[in-house]
């Protein structure tokens, strides 16, 4: 062994290493949720979700701030102290999805590779209540037997339960889900009977910088916690574990700003490094607090250039303290920044100090008593708190506002896993779903509302977003035996390339070209017969002139006659041949229907025969799959629009049989301008969830959508709302029509049009999310559906003569690149 001057070569390292048991105050788990320290303090911790501050109204933020101040006032006494931790750490984000379709597999792989290029981060808030029975109680422990000690402990636990109940009641408003907004950390037992403590898991992270489950030990906690070697230098610490080596540096406040407000430290929630912010607050008695304010006022009065306003502020503060508007307590702050590389850590520390100083605080690196700052992170470690300051409960509430981001729901949704993973400006993953359900509820298999509205101006990325979500839906095709059916009511062929890439069927309805529709070939069921009576009566109506009762009877007889024939013989022309012309009313009926028949009964061809008088009915949604219908042409034809709409919707209803079902409408205002679609959309908004389905509506014209007859249903019966950037957004449309808040409206207006950002709103929560597919040119070409790509797509289909996407997609990309290079 190397020795130098009688010391080992590692003596210097050994001197810097701390035996940490002496710095850990905890003795044991008193209950599943409560620890007891060696000094008989009781410790209980909750995880708090926090409020989604990005989209919260200022009034709500102020209200929550006052609620926190009121809570701290209500529980303040010399026996109560609080530790609050904001932990920003790396997290594993991702969704395990299996796609049968090759394009979807490729898209998902490329997209996840892009997401993984930036480390996902998460923010977590933990509130720890420390209850100190006091020295009198400690003396009683020494003079009484175990029974008396146990009785006292139970009394203290009951008092802690009362305080904890008040905390939980107040903080249930600080989260996405009232029931899960605050959850106490307890113990869990695994299938092998091993007990794990979530409280000890948090404490172990504070000591090691590494998140790992911690079992409840049989022995003392101070000898059990802390699996890393801790080496303290002049300004940096090293946390060395068997699996990793991490470095830590601390920041604290040297001077506080002149005022505080909710969310003053929110800028730190967007940073790209890991950290732990620790706040502690222990209220002092009113007499001591008043004496402190009086001393501060006297000191200012003795300074010649002191501002009179500051002295007045302190006088008002004394009055407010006496009135009980706030309490004052000892406060300490620290920020431990973690990293794997010392040089990068120094850069991160510099960034953090800049963010803090921008808000009026003087931040400084901790260089003295570095290990004290480290151990002061542990709740109830009173002796090690550095640089304590006197602070009001209102200021404390401003520094610890529990501001966070809405993260969506990863698992346990009605259809299982989240539909898609979206990035956010903060780096926190957002798990997107059409359905909106309780965050900690397992809602798999439940029929819940999932209707979604997408609002975005032209060029904002609406088509790409719609098609991307359509592709992500394909994971549910193989999820169970029922599969998935999607029907996309398209406009301007924006989804055609994508639907074809999914090996779906796409129907373009164009004036004068046979549609492939033949309603008379429907199975002869009561429901279909009733529908045919209604459809054919509409076809026979002339200029809003209704049919007579005799004409209705004649038509009904002819329908039933034709339905008894073999399917190959059932056509509109056949129907016409089975209407007798003994009366003028019957002859008028034949004349009207003749316009829809290949053989109009007068030796000619009806002008509209191409709509329904086709030899075979090609419309079939009975099998799970993806279907697209382009309405660009027929939606502008007032004469054919409603009959075609009626038939499409009747057939679509057949597909809503309990399988997962989604219908999408691009430029929904144009579709629901037709009475048939309007009635369908209005009714289905209310009932489609009972059939395991949902509708997705998009538009670039909010005014037209809001002016529709079924606008109320389209607005009120949506579980999810998506708003893309729109600097010209009309205030009345967004605030009065869509019921956005002022903050949400300003976010929609302020997002850059090329930022790929959008606002997702579900219930009371909203988040700014992002779908940035930059660099994914091949995938974007299929998702975007612009005019140039459509031309290349048509050429690729003509060259390959194949519907199989594996054949035409490669040719499509080659043609597209040649067109971009000017070779074609």
Curated annotation (Swiss-Prot):
**SUPFAM superfamilies recorded:** P-loop containing nucleoside triphosphate hydrolases
Q: Which UniProt keywords apply?
A: ATP-binding, Cell membrane, Membrane, Nucleotide-binding
Q: Name one GO molecular function term.
A: ATP binding
Which GO terms of the cellular component aspect does the record hold?
A: plasma membrane
Q: What InterPro entries does its record include?
A: CagE_TrbE_VirB, CagE_TrbE_VirB_cntrl_dom, P-loop_NTPase, T4SS_component
* Location relative to the cell: Cell membrane
Annotated ATP binding lies at 456-463
**UniProt similarity note:** Belongs to the TrbE/VirB4 family.
The record, for NCBIfam families, names: VirB4_CagE
Protein name, entry field: Type IV secretion system protein PtlC homolog
**Species name:** Bordetella bronchiseptica (strain ATCC BAA-588 / NCTC 13252 / RB50) (Alcaligenes bronchisepticus)
């Amino acid at each position: 062994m190397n020795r130098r001057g009688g010391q080992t070569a590692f003596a210097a390292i050994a001197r810097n290493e701390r035996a940490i048991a002496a710095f850990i105050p905890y003795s044991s788990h008193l209950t599943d949720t409560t620890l007891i320290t060696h000094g008989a303090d009781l410790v209980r911790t909750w995880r708090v979700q926090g409020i989604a501050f990005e989209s919260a109204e200022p009034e709500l933020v102020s209200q929550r701030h006052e609620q926190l101040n009121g809570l701290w006032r209500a529980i303040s006494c010399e026996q109560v102290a609080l530790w609050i931790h904001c932990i920003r750490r790396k997290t594993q984000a991702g969704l395990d999805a299996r796609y049968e379709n090759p394009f979807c597999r490729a898209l998902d792989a490329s997209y996840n590779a892009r997401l993984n290029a930036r480390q996902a981060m998460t923010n977590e808030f933990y509130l720890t209540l420390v209850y100190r029975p006091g020295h009198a109680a400690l003396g009683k422990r020494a003079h009484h037997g175990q029974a008396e000690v146990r009785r006292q402990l139970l009394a203290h636990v009951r008092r802690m339960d009362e305080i904890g109940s008040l905390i939980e009641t107040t903080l249930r408003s600080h989260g996405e889900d009232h029931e899960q907004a605050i959850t106490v950390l307890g113990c869990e037992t695994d299938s092998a009977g091993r007990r794990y403590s979530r409280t000890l898991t948090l404490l172990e992270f504070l000591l090691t910088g590494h998140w790992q489950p911690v079992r409840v030990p049989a022995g003392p906690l101070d000898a059990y916690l802390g699996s890393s070697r801790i080496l303290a230098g002049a300004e940096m610490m090293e946390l060395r574990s068997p699996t990793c080596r991490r470095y830590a540096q601390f920041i604290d406040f040297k001077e506080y700003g002149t005022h505080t407000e909710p969310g003053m430290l929110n800028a730190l929630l967007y940073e790209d490094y890991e950290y732990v912010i620790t706040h502690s607050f222990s209220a002092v008695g009113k007499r001591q607090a008043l004496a402190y304010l009086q001393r501060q006022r006297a000191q200012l009065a003795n300074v010649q250039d002191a501002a009179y306003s500051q002295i007045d502020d302190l006088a008002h503060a004394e009055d407010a303290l006496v009135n009980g508007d706030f309490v004052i307590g000892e406060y300490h702050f620290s920020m431990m920044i973690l990293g794997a590389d010392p040089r990068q850590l120094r850069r991160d520390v510099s960034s953090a100090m800049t963010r803090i100083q921008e808000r009026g605080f003087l931040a400084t690196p901790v260089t003295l008593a570095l290990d004290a700052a480290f151990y002061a992170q542990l709740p109830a470690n009173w002796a090690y708190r550095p640089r304590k300051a006197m602070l009001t409960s209102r200021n404390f509430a401003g520094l610890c506002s529990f501001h966070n981001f809405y993260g969506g729901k990863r698992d346990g949704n009605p259809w299982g896993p989240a539909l898609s993973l979206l990035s956010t400006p903060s780096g926190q993953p957002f798990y997107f779903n059409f359905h909106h359900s309780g965050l900690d509820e397992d809602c798999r298999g439940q029929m819940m509302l999932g209707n979604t509205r997408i609002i975005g101006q032209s060029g904002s990325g609406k088509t790409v977003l719609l098609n991307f979500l359509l592709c992500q839906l394909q994971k549910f095709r193989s999820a169970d035996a029922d599969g998935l059916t999607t029907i996309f009511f398209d406009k301007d062929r924006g989804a055609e390339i994508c639907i074809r890439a999914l090996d779906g069927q796409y129907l373009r309805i164009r004036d004068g070209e046979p549609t492939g529709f033949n309603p008379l070939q429907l199975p002869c069921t009561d429901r279909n017969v009733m529908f045919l009576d209604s459809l054919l009566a509409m076809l026979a109506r002339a200029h809003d002139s209704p049919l007579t009762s005799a004409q209705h009877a004649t038509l009904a007889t002819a329908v039933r006659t034709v339905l008894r024939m073999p399917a190959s013989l059932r056509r509109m022309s056949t129907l016409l041949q089975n209407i007798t012309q003994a009366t003028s009313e019957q002859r008028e009926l034949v004349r009207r229907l003749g316009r829809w028949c290949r053989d109009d009964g007068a030796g000619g061809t009806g002008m509209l025969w191409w709509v329904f008088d086709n030899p075979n009915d090609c419309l079939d949604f009975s099998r799970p799959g993806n279907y697209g219908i382009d309405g660009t042409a027929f939606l502008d034809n007032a004469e054919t629009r409603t009959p075609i709409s009626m038939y499409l919707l009747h057939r679509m209803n057949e597909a809503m049989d309990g399988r997962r079902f989604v219908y999408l409408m691009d430029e929904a205002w144009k579709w629901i301008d037709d009475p048939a679609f309007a009635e369908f959309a209005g009714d289905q908004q209310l009932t489609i969830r009972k059939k395991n389905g949902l509708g997705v509506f998009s538009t670039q014209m909010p005014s037209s959508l809001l002016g529709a007859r079924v606008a109320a249903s389209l607005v009120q019966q949506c579980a999810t709302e998506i708003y893309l950037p729109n600097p010209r957004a009309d205030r009345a449309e967004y605030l009065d029509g869509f019921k956005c808040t002022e903050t949400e409206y300003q976010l929609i207006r302020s997002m850059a049009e090329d930022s790929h950002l959008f606002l997702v709103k579900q219930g009371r929560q909203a988040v700014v999310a992002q779908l940035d597919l930059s660099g994914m040119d091949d995938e974007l070409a299929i998702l975007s559906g612009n005019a140039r790509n459509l031309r290349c797509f048509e050429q690729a289909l003509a060259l390959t003569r194949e519907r199989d996407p594996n054949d035409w997609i490669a040719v499509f990309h080659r043609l597209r690149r040649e067109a971009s290079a000017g070779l074609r």
